Amino acid sequence: MLQQADGVSPDRSSCDTPAPRTFEVRTYGCQMNVHDSERLSGLLEQAGYQRAGAGVDADIVVFNTCAVRENADNKLYGNLSHLAPRKQADPQMQIAVGGCLAQKDRDAVLRKAPWVDVVFGTHNIGSLPTLLDRARHNRVAQVEIAESLREFPSALPASRESAYAAWVSISVGCNNTCTFCIVPSLRGKEVDRRPGDVLAEVQALVDQGVLEITLLGQNVNAYGVSFADPTEARDRGAFAKLLRACGRIDGLERVRFTSPHPAEFTDDVIEAMAQTSNVCPTLHMPLQSGSDRILRAMRRSYRADRYLGIIDRVRTAIPHAAITTDLIVGFPGETEEDFQATLDVVEAARFSSAFTFQYSKRPGTPAAELEGQIPKAVVSERYQRLIELQERISWEENRAQIGREVELLVATGEGRKDAATARMSGRARDGRLVHFAPGALGADIRPGDIVVTTVTGAAPHHLIADAGPAEHRRTRAGDAHAEGRTPKTGVGLGMPGIGAPEPAPVTQGCAL
């Protein structure tokens, strides 16, 4: 950027140009929302807004909300209340609420927080800049909630958070009917992107230096049953084929995916995981409960034996795979015997870690109407027992890693104590978090680089590697991070809206 020399009058036209309005996106909930927030940021930047710096009050605050848990409502409306005095003092400030809670509450958002300017649903991400302009011009709050998907969010511009790792959405929505989950009613039925579109986005990211991608969907192993493009044939084996295709992309070093459903987890996916070198040896597969009776009540169309059988086959094919899960404690009607069944499955499964939740009653879900709602004190006591069991298992599994050589993708923001301990942090191929001593190479190692080191210690939630790096490889991702560059995608990838793609243009002679 050119700097103004001392004593030289600035160009008057530049002084007359108003400073760009700034924005901040606050994200709650799952990885889908994190990825959607990258799209929201990309849209706002494309529209001329600038991301607000740390500690700076933004002109526009966007909430990308979650509706899965009860405290999501409390968190949103509490934060909106905190912004009310700012809005009153500065009417030009704008507040937008999107995501699953906006889709669910709709006009209720304005009744509860009338100072909000824009409410937009899960299918209206692309409308945000227009809605902000309209609200500012008309001085009237704008509400836009579409009932079905009109275009894939992945066709929108994205402002990625990381130079070295990226989300890639392969589907939107869900066809399952879990009784505790409100997501299908808010995000709609599953719609799958064409494999070529997914791979084009992956290639675009790799071309910009990204080393790791995570394929994202509510139920990734149902991929292929409901393509948006009606000319794309239904293919139950599409997800395994997609994994193998990712393995053929030069420069893509790590592939992860989340989340599969146990009822649709097939052996072709296990084979693809084992035979595709850049697919990471890790699996996150929600269990929810170890009780067959509770699984039936949840409408989870598998049973504990099937779940454990999948894990056994994964570990046979990939011996060092780290397996993680989601668990719900206190589902309506859960008895002590049901809860003990969950503890038994957790003990047998030997998860490396687990996301554990106390059941939260959500209006609009079948489970909210079930008899046998469990007292909070009972749920809390069971939750604590489950946490203690999983902490013990996680620590035992992590201690088993001591002495093992690990390859780390160096990360930023993963180690809260890195500055105090003179360590850096990275993720092993199996997803474990490792805090490592950089040794004499410290000044040369950047986030996005690859380091090989040996595990010397363990805690329940991380590993320690204080032996110093045995290898360090500088990468294009590390270069990009050092230069402050993050990849941009979503424009020019040939990604269609919903429906068949436009016909290809007629070419003369040879065309590549």
UniProtKB/Swiss-Prot annotation:
Its cofactor is [4Fe-4S] cluster. Binds 2 [4Fe-4S] clusters. One cluster is coordinated with 3 cysteines and an exchangeable S-adenosyl-L-methionine. [4Fe-4S] cluster 2 binds at residues 174, 178, 181. Its main location: cytoplasm. Residues 21-137 form the MTTase N-terminal domain. The keyword Ligase does not apply. SUPFAM superfamilies: Radical SAM enzymes. PROSITE patterns: MTTASE_N, MTTASE_RADICAL, RADICAL_SAM, TRAM. It is found in: Cytoplasm. Residues 470-486 have a biased composition (Basic and acidic residues). It is an enzyme of class 2 (transferase). One of its GO terms (molecular function) is N6-isopentenyladenosine methylthiotransferase activity. Monomer. [4Fe-4S] cluster 1 binds at residues 30, 66, 100. It comes from the Bacteria. Keywords: 4Fe-4S, Cytoplasm, Iron, Iron-sulfur, Metal-binding, S-adenosyl-L-methionine, Transferase, tRNA processing. InterPro entries: Elp3/MiaA/NifB-like_rSAM, Methylthiotransferase, Methylthiotransferase_CS, Methylthiotransferase_N, Methylthiotransferase_N_sf, MiaB_methiolase, rSAM, rSAM_horseshoe. Pfam families: Radical_SAM (PF04055), UPF0004 (PF00919). Belongs to the methylthiotransferase family. MiaB subfamily. Residues 1-20, 470-512 are annotated as: Disordered. One of its GO terms (cellular component) is cytosol. The keyword Secreted does not apply. This is tRNA-2-methylthio-N(6)-dimethylallyladenosine synthase. It catalyses: N(6)-dimethylallyladenosine(37) in tRNA + (sulfur carrier)-SH + AH2 + 2 S-adenosyl-L-methionine = 2-methylsulfanyl-N(6)-dimethylallyladenosine(37) in tRNA + (sulfur carrier)-H + 5'-deoxyadenosine + L-methionine + A + S-adenosyl-L-homocysteine + 2 H(+). Residues 399-469 form the TRAM domain. Residues 160-397 form the Radical SAM core domain.
